[in-house]
Amino acid sequence: MTLQRAAQPMPVDIAEILAEQRLRDAYDDRPAYQRNDYLAWIARAKRPETRTKRITQMLDELAEGGVYMGMRHRPSRR
């Protein structure tokens, strides 16, 4: 049995921020589970401040590379 999480839609504001900061390619290079987890994590924020903080963390990790949800990770071999 394979467990699958529901695919998260890309919010317009996040797509715009990724484009503005030229991080869309870094986002797209991540494995599908990471992209989906980032969006689900951001969507679960109850307060606007929390959502903003999570978006900022995602952007920082994409810019730095080799970091996912505060943990080191090897880049995928695409």
Predicted regions located by residue number:
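Charge-dense, helix-prone N-terminal extensions
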Residues: 1-78
